[in-house]
Amino acid sequence: MLYPRALLPAAVALASLVLAVPLEERQLAFDFNNQKVRGVNLGGWFVLEPWITPSIFQQWANGGDVIDEYSYTAALGKDEAFTRLNNHWATWITEEDFAEIASMGLNHVRIPIGYWALVAIPNDPYVQGQLSYVDRAIDWARKNGLKVMLDLHGAPGSQNGFDNSGRTGTIAWQSGDNVPNTLRAIQALAERYAPQTDVVTAIELLNEPANWGNDLSQIKKFYYDGWGNVRTQGQTAVTIHDAFLDPRSWNGFMNSEAGVNNVILDTHIYQVFSQNEVAMKPCAHVQTACSSIDKIKPTDKWTIVGEWTGAQTDCAKWLNGLGKGARYDGTLPGHSEGYYGSCDKKYEGTVDSMLPVDKTNLQYFVEAQLDAYESHTGWFFWTWKTESAPEWHFQNLTRAGLIPQPLDSRKVPSQCGTSQCLVPGN
């Protein structure tokens, strides 16, 4: 549903009139006002990321042009790519995962999906077939009492140039027909899944559109248009990402006074993707997590931290891109000016093999983040599982006792209520 910018207020009013939607939030299957979202991302399932599943990319570990799902499918060709990916889709996440997710006290999963699963664009190398597995995921969630947020994780042209958009490099999302094709994908996603209101509580219009390389006014117009697309199918909540801006800067946009309803703001909080962040000591990581309360609590719409992690370094194998090193130990090209520690036991391995001090630091960090992010609507940890990145592996961190069970228990209560450093040895 495309609206000329000048007609946005009228279009929103018309959509509300046609659907008989009052401006206040309608009752949904999940009470975002009074319940906390506690969820995990099912990363690496339908949008490949080399660091989550390095085995899929291992044949190009020593060089080559394959660095993301676009180049992966282009290199293999559609037939071979489908064979390999279909096996991956069938095995990476199963019904047993959903059962364990529910057993850990979580109530949501966030499922990243690329546009290519929904809309085929000529000359794209991507393959289709993901939706039958998404259908299964919805059924598994229903069976296990879980809710689902569907997340359009990759847009044509790439909305951020990251490998997690499907294609690394230039940001070209707002060129040509890319935005209209993204809206086609949203429409297809909404038509297929929004009616399943007992399970699908929200549709995220686009993951991490960059505020650089894109026109912010066009991002905002896209959000209105995408909201209109979802509203043709009912009252499912619509999630918008903050485009890496201060969440408070979105106050007044797409709230009830603006004539829209059921909008969730998504912010992602990592402390590993800059030199200054990886240089921080464990106490500084905790304090930074707690300081996020001041940014998310004053927002005027439901606000979730849709991605966060236990990692305090960027050591995980290929986290910065296939074949690339880390800022933390000075091995990332162009970021060799500092050395803050060894990536031993952090580059790859298991939670059990982590150093005791790293386990302790992670446990304190995770508990502080849980306290901070539940100051508003809730959170989704990134990610449920990885092949070899222990600090990012919710399943194994929880099994090892480093993420609390139940989720509201604390080894160290009220870390965000004191200015003192409570992390041992710091």
UniProtKB/Swiss-Prot annotation:
A GO MF label: glucan exo-1,3-beta-glucosidase activity
Active site: 208, 307
Gene Ontology process terms (BP): cell wall organization; glucan catabolic process
Subcellular location(s) of the protein: Secreted
Main location: secreted
EC numbers on record: 3.2.1.58
Signal peptide stretch: 1-20
Reaction it catalyzes: Successive hydrolysis of beta-D-glucose units from the non-reducing ends of (1->3)-beta-D-glucans, releasing alpha-glucose
Pfam families, per database record: Cellulase
Disulphide connectivity of cysteines: 290-416, 315-343
GO cellular component: cell surface; extracellular region
Keywords: Cell wall biogenesis/degradation, Disulfide bond, Glycosidase, Hydrolase, Secreted, Signal, Zymogen
Function: Beta-glucanases participate in the metabolism of beta-glucan, the main structural component of the cell wall. It could also function biosynthetically as a transglycosylase.
Family: Belongs to the glycosyl hydrolase 5 (cellulase A) family.
Protein name (Swiss-Prot/TrEMBL): Glucan 1,3-beta-glucosidase
Organism of provenance: Blumeria graminis
Lineage: Eukaryota, Fungi, Dikarya, Ascomycota, Pezizomycotina
